[in-house]
A protein has these predicted regions:
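Short, solvent-exposed loop/beta-turn-alpha elements that line the ligand-binding surface or hinge
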Residues: 1, 40-57, 66-81, 120-161, ...
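Extracellular/periplasmic solute-recognition and catalytic clefts
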Residues: 5-73, 103-108
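Ligand/substrate-recognition segments at binding pockets and active sites
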Residues: 9, 145-160, 170-257
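Periplasmic-binding protein-like
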Residues: 76-136, 142, 146-168, 209, ...
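Bilobed periplasmic-binding protein-like "clamshell/Venus-flytrap" ligand-binding domains
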Residues: 100-103, 170-203, 254, 300-337
Length: 365
């Protein structure tokens, strides 16, 4: 191929472009709706066919729901036990709706994760590892919230009861199964003891993997007197502007990862105050032990040692309750079977080696 024309386009136009012939190769979000549309275009109930050929790999990154420790805290002490409990109340309810939401949006093309790290990383904890826990699955007393025989509805109710325990630990007053005061002893608004807002860039139409999590959690929290406002943004720049201004309570987003799982950029807060130029402003974690572990881990070449250090880091991050890990999704690259000579496309595409790595070999029919 001598010339390649790269086009910036809207998500809705990616698949349609390949189907209609205006685009040869694209990378649509691989949602259940996208899969259905590809199968329909191929007319063979398969994502590979006469119209479209699909290649999938695990995404080098993951989706999450974040919280700012600077806005979501008690008595302006982001790292206190009370502040962590306050955030864990919300995180517990959010976490319990991950399974149903991700299954609804992605189907089998994504999985729920329990630590804030991509499953593509060698440092990602595995279910068989010692100390592995489902995210936000213990109550304020450190006891398991769920049992293996619980139904989904029973889990939702158990999460609410656990949230009440965390709100009490944060200093809120709870009466008859409802939160009746915030940690300061008053009310956030005339109608609610606690009112918070979650921002989600779902194109103004609920098109986001975490949208169902937030809306279901909002309905559930309402039952215990807590108001979670879900704001669906049509322009994602509003999300980043609000986060950077340190005015966001909660937000849905995703991290891109690198081959090396170094956590310095996102979680290091600086040994003598906030580190300039990093991404720690997203959560405002300020934890001396976490800082030391991050520096120790990045100073070593021993992968086994680093994995142990990073697991300790992840446990601290989860304890701060500023990030609810949500999903590990698959990436899809779709090719026009009619126009692209698939024999010339990279045969062994992986998370780390994409079709662009051998773009010089790609030919059109």
């Amino acid at each position: 191929t001598k010339y390649v024309n790269f086009l910036q386009t809207q998500e809705d136009d990616k698949l349609n472009g390949v189907i209609t012939g205006t685009v040869d190769i694209s990378d649509p979000s691989f949602s259940a709706n996208t899969v259905d549309a590809i199968k329909k275009a191929n007319a063979n109930d398969d994502v590979n066919g006469p119209k479209i050929t699909t290649d999938t790999v695990d995404n080098l990154g993951y989706g999450y729901i974040g919280m700012s420790a600077n806005t979501m805290n008690v008595n302006n002490e982001p790292g206190s036990d009370a502040s962590k409990a306050y955030r864990k109340a919300f995180a517990t309810v959010l976490a319990v709706y991950r399974d149903v939401a991700i299954d609804s949006y992605y189907g089998e093309r994504a999985s729920v994760i329990n630590y804030p790290i991509s499953n593509t990383s060698w440092a990602a904890p595995q279910a068989s590892d010692p100390g592995y826990k489902v995210a936000f699955s213990v109550d304020a007393d450190g006891k398991d919230i769920y049992t293996s025989d619980m139904t989904a509805d029973q889990k939702y109710e158990a999460a609410l009861q656990a949230a009440l325990g965390f709100f009490e630990k944060a200093g809120c007053k709870v009466e008859n199964g409802k939160v009746v005061s915030n940690p300061a002893g008053g009310k956030d608004t005339d109608a609610y003891a606690i009112e918070r807002e979650a921002l989600i860039p779902a194109d103004g139409k609920g098109d986001h993997p975490s949208f169902m999590i937030l809306t279901e959690a909002s309905k559930a929290l309402e039952k215990i007197g807590v108001h979670l406002i879900v704001t669906d943004l049509s322009d994602s720049t509003q999300l980043w502007d609000t986060i950077e201004a340190d005015q966001a309570d909660m937000f849905a987003a995703a991290w891109g990862a690198t081959v090396d799982p170094d956590m310095y950029q996102i979680y290091f807060s600086g040994m003598d105050g906030k580190a300039a130029g990093g991404s720690n402003y997203m959560y405002d974690i300020n934890d001396a032990e976490l800082n030391k572990l991050i520096l120790d881990a990045r100073a070593s070449l021993d992968q086994s040692y680093r994995k142990t250090m990073y697991k300790a880091c992840l446990d601290i991050i989860v304890d701060w309750a500023v990030e609810v890990p949500v999903y590990q999704r698959q990436n899809a690259v779709i090719f026009s079977t009619e126009r692209v000579n698939m024999e010339t496309v990279t045969p062994d595409i992986t998370t780390f080696y994409g079709w662009l790595s051998e773009i010089q070999n790609v030919e059109l029919n």
